[in-house]
Design a protein with these regions (language model features):
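C-terminal transmembrane helical hairpin of 12-TM major facilitator-type secondary transporters
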Residues: 300-347
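Residue-level signature of mid-helix packing/kink "hotspots" within the transmembrane helices
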Residues: 29, 57-65, 148-149, 283-291, ...
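Conserved MFS/SLC helix-loop-helix module at the cytosolic interface between two early adjacent transmembrane helices
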Residues: 62-99
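Extracytoplasmic gate region of multi-pass secondary transporters
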Residues: 31-32, 231-287
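Helix-breaking motifs and short loop linkers at transmembrane-helix boundaries and internal kinks
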Residues: 43, 75, 96-101, 130, ...
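Cytoplasmic helix-loop-helix junction between adjacent transmembrane helices
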Residues: 106-144
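A late C-terminal transmembrane helix in Major Facilitator Superfamily
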Residues: 354-389
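Helix-loop-helix hairpin linking two adjacent transmembrane segments in secondary transporters
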Residues: 143-192
Length: 436
C-alpha cells in the first residue's frame, strides 16, 4: 500500500512546495492586471513600464542559478523560506512605492526573490518525495497555474474594494507572509528549518549530506572520472529554451490576438479587459493539463516520450491559431492550454531523473533560467513580428519553434542511455562518450 500512497512527510513536502509555487506565480502575474493603472498614475509610457517589467522578469530567470546552488548547499526548505518571505516583503514594498524609481527597485526585488522558488521548491520535492514523483510534480504544476489564474481576479477584487492597484500587492504580500510563517514552522524530517546562524556557518543540508544516490541517479564514475553529463540532460535544457519561448510568447500575446481576431471582443467597449478575461479563462484548462502531465508520468514506462507527444499536438494547434478567428480560435486555444501545460510537470520529472540528488537544486536552477530567462526573448521577438507582420504571424512562427522543440524532445528519448564521462588524468581533463 505504501507504494501507492505518499507518506505524511511526503504530502507535507508536496503541499509546502506547491503552496510556494502558488504564491510565486500569483506575485509575478499581478503586474499584467494592474499595468495600465500603474502607468497612468506615474505618468509612465508603456515602453518605460515594459522595461521595468523586463528587468523583473530577467531577474526572475537569472536568479534561479544561484538559488539552485544555495538550495544544494543550505537545504531546499531553508532557501524556500527565504524566497517566500523575500517575495512577500517585496510585494509590500511595491504596494508602498511612490514614484518610478522606488517602484522599479521594489519590482526588481520581487522578481529576484520569486526566482528562488523553482530550483528550491522542485529540489524540495525531488529529494523529499520518493514514490509517485510524477503526481507530486503534477500537484505542484496545478497550484502554480492556479496562482496565475487567480491573480488577475485578486487584483480586480482588491481594486474594486479599495480603489487602488496598491491594495493588490499589499493584500498578496500579507497573505504571503502568513504562508511564510506556516512554511517556517512546519517540520520536515531531513530538512533544516531556516536559521541565520546555521547558514552563516555554511552547514549543508543534513539529508543531502547523509544520503547517497537515489534509484534514479546515474551510476557513479570509477577511477579517475570526475563527472558525468547525461546527453539527455543537454537536450532537456535545450528544450527548456524553446518551450520558454512558447510559454512567454503565447501568454503575452494571447490578449492582443483575441482583440484582433475575436469579434465580440473587438466590438466591446472594453476590449482590453475582455481579452484579459478570455485569456484567464483559457489558462484554466492549463490546470487540468498540469495535473494530467504529472499523473501520466507515474503510469508510462517511457516518460521521455511524453514531451515529444505534447509538441506533436501543439505544433499544428499553433498553425490553426494563426489561421482561425472567433469561436474556432477560442476552442483551439483552449485545447492548446490543455495540452501544452502538461509539459512542465514531465520536464521537471525528467530533470530530477537525469541530475544527481546532490545537484538537484542547480539542475532546476539552470532549467528555470533557460525556461524563463532566455525564453523571455519571445516578448521582444513577438513585439517585432506583431508590429511588422501582425500578431497572427507570430503564432505561425511559434508553430515552427514547436516543431523544433518536438525534434529536441525526441532526441531526449534516443539519447537517454548515453552520457559524457569527464576525467582528470595527470592534471589533464579529458572526456569520452559512453553508453550505459
Amino acid at each position: 500500500m505504501t507504494q501507492h500512497r505518499h507518506t505524511d512527510t511526503e504530502m507535507r513536502v508536496i503541499w509546502l512546495a506547491s503552496g510556494s509555487h502558488f504564491v510565486t506565480h500569483g506575485f509575478m502575474t499581478l503586474f499584467s492586471a494592474v499595468m495600465v493603472v500603474i502607468a497612468g498614475e506615474n505618468s509612465m509610457s508603456f515602453m518605460a513600464i515594459g522595461m521595468i517589467a523586463n528587468v523583473g522578469y530577467f531577474l526572475y530567470g537569472l536568479g534561479g542559478i544561484p538559488a539552485g546552488y544555495l538550495a544544494d548547499r543550505y537545504g531546499a526548505k531553508q532557501v524556500l523560506t527565504i524566497g517566500v518571505f523575500g517575495m512577500s516583503i517585496s510585494s509590500l514594498l511595491v504596494g508602498l512605492s511612490f514614484g518610478t524609481w522606488p517602484f522599479a527597485v521594489s519590482y526588481a526585488l520581487l522578481g529576484l526573490f520569486c526566482s528562488i522558488h523553482h530550483p528550491a521548491g522542485l529540489s524540495f520535492i525531488a529529494r523529499g518525495v520518493g514514490s509517485r514523483r510524477g503526481k507530486a510534480m503534477g500537484i505542484h504544476g496545478v497550484l502554480g497555474n492556479l496562482g496565475m489564474f487567480l491573480a488577475p481576479m485578486t487584483a480586480a477584487g482588491s481594486i474594486w474594494l479599495f480603489h487602488s492597484w496598491r491594495s493588490a500587492y499589499l493584500a498578496s504580500g500579507a497573505a504571503g507572509l502568513v504562508f511564510g510563517v506556516i512554511l517556517h514552522l512546519t517540520k520536515v524530517p531531513g530538512e533544516l528549518d531556516f536559521s541565520f546562524k546555521a547558514m552563516a556557518q555554511g552547514r549543508l543540508q543534513k539529508a543531502a549530506a547523509a544520503s547517497g544516490r537515489n534509484d534514479q541517479d546515474p551510476a557513479p564514475v570509477k577511477g579517475d572520472s570526475t563527472g558525468i553529463l547525461p546527453i539527455a540532460l543537454i537536450f532537456l535544457f535545450l528544450g527548456s529554451i524553446l518551450s520558454g519561448f512558447i510559454f512567454r510568447g503565447s501568454l503575452t500575446f494571447f490578449p492582443a490576438l483575441f482583440r484582433q481576431e475575436v469579434r465580440f471582443i473587438t466590438n466591446s467597449d472594453q476590449p482590453v479587459v475582455m481579452a484579459g478575461y478570455l485569456t484567464t479563462a483559457i489558462l484554466f484548462f492549463g490546470l487540468i493539463g498540469a495535473w494530467f502531465g504529472g499523473y501520466i508520468n507515474d503510469k508510462i514506462k517511457r516518460p521521455e516520450l511524453f514531451p515529444a507527444v505534447v509538441f506533436i499536438v501543439v505544433t499544428p494547434l499553433f498553425y490553426l491559431i494563426s489561421r482561425y478567428s472567433d469561436s474556432k480560435l477560442i476552442a483551439i486555444s483552449c485545447v492548446f492550454s490543455l495540452v501544452y501545460y502538461s509539459w512542465q510537470p514531465c520536464q521537471n520529472y525528467l530533470v530530477a531523473k537525469y541530475t544527481k540528488r546532490a545537484f538537484h537544486g542547480m539542475g532546476f536552477g539552470i532549467n528555470f533560467f533557460l525556461l524563463f530567462g532566455l525564453g523571455s526573448i519571445a516578448t521582444s521577438v513577438g513585439g517585432y513580428v506583431t508590429d511588422q507582420f501582425g500578431v497572427d504571424r507570430f503564432y505561425g512562427l511559434m508553430a515552427i519553434i514547436s516543431a523544433v522543440a518536438m525534434l529536441v524532445a525526441l532526441a531526449v528519448y534516443f539519447t537517454k542511455n548515453y552520457q559524457i564521462l569527464f576525467s582528470r588524468i595527470q592534471g589533464r581533463l579529458s572526456w569520452k562518450l559512453e553508453k550505459e
